[in-house]
Amino acid sequence: YAFVIIGFNHDTLASATAYGSATATGKAGISLQMKDCLNTTYQMNSSNTNSGGWGNCALRTTLQNTIKGQLPSAWQSIIKTVTKKASAGSTSSTISSYSDTLFLLAEVEIFGSTTYSAVGEGDQYAWYKAGNSKVKKVNGSANFWWERSPFATGSSYFCIVYSAGNASSSYANGSFGVAFGFCV
């Protein structure tokens, strides 16, 4: 799999001393994301719910507990835990913070604005602000890919990036692409 640098000094470190001593910015140096998606599609949850938001979804657990373990050990040892924000789901506008090693991007981090998600889930990454493509492939074909953002006005959906690269949303038990990010 290929990864692209999507930002520098963008993500807030969960621990100010993640590099051994406090950093001047409190930010992770480099943020990366998969250029395309994993070859396997995943559901956010086995049922159509976004209750509990990103913090309570099955895919977050899979990323942290399974997929991270499949990365090269040299990578695992340098990945930093960062604080990511997302709404609490179930149409809540409350923004919660989560400590993550691997994460999905929020709608605003990709598009720079919110169409289907709650306000306050982060800021647009430089990679996307520069106009780079939002289309990602699963096994060579453009596909929908998951965001960590719960749908703001319904309790069954999470936000996705449509196969054409535009903002959309879909049922939480849909099986879509995963293009995770991480920081070093």
Predicted segments — roles?
Residues 1-184:
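Collagenous Gly-X-Y triple-helix signature in extracellular proteins
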